[in-house]
Swiss-Prot record:
InterPro entries: Poxvirus_A11. The keyword Coiled coil applies. It is found in: Host cytoplasm. It comes from the Viruses. Its main location: host cell. One of its GO terms (cellular component) is host cell cytoplasm. Induction: Expressed in the late phase of the viral replicative cycle. This is Protein A11 homolog.
Amino acid sequence: MTGLMVTDITNIAKEYNLTAFSEDVYPCNKNYELTNGQLSALKTINVVLTTRSDNYEKDVTYNDDDDHDRCIVSEIGSHHSFNDEKDNYIQSNNIQQTPSLSAVFDDNKRVHLLEQEIAELRKKKTKSKNLLDFTNTLFNKNPLRIGILNKRAIILNYASMNNSPLTMEDLEACEDEEIENMYISIKQYHEVHKKKLIVTNIISILISVIEQLLVRIGFDEIKGLSKEVTSTIIDLEIGEDCEQLATKMGVANNPVINISLFILKIFIRRINIL
């Protein structure tokens, strides 16, 4: 009895061993995970279906001599029913045995497919030229409302002003922290630029006053010097020095001071105050 039980247990265990059953028409020739017991059951079903089909052909041949029309009508109906059952069984069997996505592709393959899909979607997106033009117009005409503009749009506008090829698609690949750092850098640059502009205007005014003083004394050759020394030349020659001077003096970025110095610079160049 003990030997019989051990043999039965061994046979049962063998029924649950996995087999390598594959189908050539299945994508990537993936294997079905079937046990020996399941494979034996499928073979038995195949034998039964083949036997029933053979018996049907024999019955049709035998009944042809007695009542051909009646047999054909009745047997055709049963044959269609039998075929329908067979098709339904095969379809349901295929559906149940279809492996999941995790079984077909590993994690690296799925990540690669997702990256390809994202790249294709980005190619289909419209270019940001219209947005860049609109932002440029809005930025230049409404400087007081710069705070409500999108940070990415401000970065694009700054890149456009400096003739740097940059699009919204390039910024979408950046993280929020990187966008924040670029925005802060641009904001700090504008603050320093405004402070440096105050020192530049003061230098232009001093040059105009000194020019008029020297012309009044008798140095006519110096006339027109203030027109030659433009803000661009000052920024190119001593721009960094003006920036350091503005920082050390603690010059504040005051719009009133900027406007006043700008107007004073224009009038001094046109009017002889000495």
